[in-house]
C-alpha cells in the first residue's frame, strides 16, 4: 500500500516480490485521504515528505482478532507469514542488487 507519491517504489517492490515468490501479491496506490491507506506507521513518513510503503495481510479485514485481546499467536498463520517473509527477503535482495553501482 502506498500514497500516490510512493507509487513508483510500490511498483518496484511488487515486481521484485513477484519475481522472488509465488505467493499472491496485490498492491494499491491511493491518495492519502483514502480510508485505510494511512492506517499505520508508514503514513508518518509521508507527513514528513518521505516515501513509505506498508506490507499488509489486510489486518482486521482478514483476522477478526486484530488489535483485540484475542489477538494471540494461535490466531496467526505462521506458514503464510513465513512465505511472505521469504518473498520480502528476496525482493529486498533484488532491489539492493539493482541499486548497487
Question: Model-found features: residue ranges?
Answer:
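Active-site-adjacent substrate-binding region
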Residues: 1-101
Amino acid at each position: 500500500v502506498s500514497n500516490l507519491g510512493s507509487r513508483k517504489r510500490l511498483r518496484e517492490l511488487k515486481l521484485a516480490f513477484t519475481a522472488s515468490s509465488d505467493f499472491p501479491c496485490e498492491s494499491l496506490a491511493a491518495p492519502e485521504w483514502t480510508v485505510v491507506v494511512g492506517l499505520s506507521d508508514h503514513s508518518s513518513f509521508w507527513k514528513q515528505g518521505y516515501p513509505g510503503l506498508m506490507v499488509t495481510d489486510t489486518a482486521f479485514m482478514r483476522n477478526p482478532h486484530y488489535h483485540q485481546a484475542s489477538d494471540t499467536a494461535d490466531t496467526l498463520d505462521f506458514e503464510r507469514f513465513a512465505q511472505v517473509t521469504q518473498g520480502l527477503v528476496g525482493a529486498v535482495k533484488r532491489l539492493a542488487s539493482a541499486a548497487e553501482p
